[in-house]
Amino acid sequence: MKQQIQLRRREVDETADLPAELPPLLRRLYASRGVRSAHELERSVKGMLPWQQLSGVEKAVEILYNAFREGTRIIVVGDFDADGATSTALSVLAMRSLGCSNIDYLVPNRFEDGYGLSPEVVDQAHARGAQLIVTVDNGISSHAGVEHARSLSIPVIVTDHHLPGDTLPAAEAIINPNLRDCNFPSKSLAGVGVAFYLMLALRTFLRDQGWFDERGIAIPNLAELLDLVALGTVADVVPLDANNRILTWQGMSRIRAGKCRPGIKALLEVANRDPQKLAASDLGFALGPRLNAAGRLDDMSVGVALLLCDNIGEARVLANELDALNQTRKEIEQGMQIEALTLCEKLERSRDTLPGGLAMYHPEWHQGVVGILASRIKERFHRPVIAFAPAGDGTLKGSGRSIQGLHMRDALERLDTLYPGMMLKFGGHAMAAGLSLEEDKFELFQQRFGELVTEWLDPSLLQGEVVSDGPLSPAEMTMEVAQLLRDAGPWGQMFPEPLFDGHFRLLQQRLVGERHLKVMVEPVGGGPLLDGIAFNVDTALWPDNGVREVQLAYKLDINEFRGNRSLQIIIDNIWPI
């Protein structure tokens, strides 16, 4: 059942018109990631796309302006992931700074309320005195919730980035770059990015109406909230296109300079990350999971409270609570992975090979962790995966992750068309989606999903591969180049961190921490001795003292320990030669 991993080198677009002063290595890396001109490398706020191109913004800011003037009770309804938490906190903080005092927030509980603006969540908002609801990172599929709000005379502004269905909810205003009639050039804004753009537009409208002058309020600097935008954008794994790179870089720069929310500072502390050396990967792999742990296992209100609090002492208490939840999440996930691999073995034995698309269910799985499980199994077997857990009412909740070549939401939409009623509801993106179905429909869904993936996907796309930026010359294997690469980001989804490959002599190898392989290597053609580490190796294969030469796929990195800096390579894949 071991997945064979192939190595492929990226193609470089030789027609890219990049600045001549860029180092040749960076020109190569940028050109192979679709960057075609200098303006796509802009990282200052002046390079941001203008909010005026987002459809629905003018209507939304007019509604909000009138709500501000009349003292209307505004309830922000968020989502229970990191994007939803940052969107919620940003919207509340921004509107407070803009002069709104009658504002509160509500985050649906994953286990009691489910996703989005449901009628039940509307009732909760109504009980809190809502006179206007603003959704963030949800709402585009909340037809019933919006209708229920209308029946209670509560207008709704929907801000979302998820893909819309054929019909839209009957909200007073909808802001979503993925609307069919929206001309916003970037379709990759996270929910927190959409919320930030709405707040920029609202600030401009309020200024033009004389709002700040009338009340003697200083016009707020909304750039102070870009730390939240960066965290939500990276944690939600949206593509880091040119506009998202600006938002992320600006937010990271504020965090590095110590100009961030106390909650983010506290998360960095519990994750043992130095703010001054922050990388985008720290947001995705250290802060994001801790924030997400609240929504996965408990209640995301803890995460939002952390991001909203102004006191570092209070923030540290909440961050430690999230850190403990994340540790529990890891333990739950580890057990679920073992069970999932057992299910894969059974599937393979019964069918001679794994299906092209995997739908998996275990009655003891935790619905807050199935998304991570789907990601892990997808990475291991390189095929679309949907993992289900019981919702406790005779239904299952599933979370899916896809690979390049299969649009997950489109696949679910096709299944819904072919087999009406098989799913209760679904939604999502190209690479991730969520759905629910009745428990007795699981086996049918498992079969139909596998068949659809087999029909839609070329078998070659199910072959695991590592995509490399090619070799580094010995002269490029230096601390200076490693620092250059670190500073050339932010790297992330659809703009991956540089990965190189090469042929090396394996001089030393030993296990550290049970499953990590520590090595010393030297380029076969001559070059510097390099320390390297490969994480979570197959200990049945490594170390192998009979192997003298290896092909490596690796990242050039700087190891910082007790004030000392040294060059090292992080090995993604190792092949004996």
Language-model regions, residue ranges each:
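Acidic-glycine-rich active-site phosphate/pyrophosphate-binding loop
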Residues: 66, 166-176, 264, 521-528
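Short alpha-helical basic/polar micro-motif
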Residues: 193, 371, 375, 552
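Mid-to-C-terminal polyanion-binding domains and interfaces
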Residues: 69-70, 314-320, 324-360, 393, ...
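Active-site cavity-forming subdomains of large catalytic enzyme subunits
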Residues: 123-192, 196-216
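Hydrophobic helix-and-loop "lid/oligomerization" segment in the mid-to-C-terminal part
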Residues: 2, 8-131, 152-153, 204-441, ...
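A residue-level signal for conserved active-site and pocket-lining positions in enzyme catalytic cores
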Residues: 30, 134, 292, 485, ...
